Design a protein with these regions (language model features):
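Intrinsically disordered, low-complexity, mixed-charge
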Residues: 1-91
Length: 91
């Protein structure tokens, strides 16, 4: 099981990035959440089988056609996360 906390920079807000990520995370059976940050970045938590999370990261690096992904900051997530869904969080 892989657990990653990521920050995505670039043109990733107001382009449907969170909804796109929600859809592909569900297709890949990856759990966690995604939300916009006040810094025009997108933050996400990804949990799932190593292969599924790795495939999702590759897709995130490309992003949807409306986005321009600049950089991905990836850190291992150490805390426990019990939800078995992928959610879009709103502030």
């Amino acid at each position: 099981m892989k657990k990653l906390h990521i920050i995505i920079t670039g043109k990733v807000q107001r382009v449907g990035f969170r909804y796109w990520l929600h859809q592909i995370a569900n297709e890949k059976n990856v759990y966690g959440w995604v939300k916009n940050k006040n810094t025009n970045e997108v933050e996400a938590l990804l949990l799932g089988k190593d292969k599924n999370v790795d495939e999702l990261i590759k897709l995130i690096r490309k992003g949807p056609s409306s986005a321009r992904v600049g950089n991905l900051s990836i850190q291992n997530y150490q805390k426990e996360y019990l939800r078995k869904s992928f959610d879009i969080l709103h502030d």
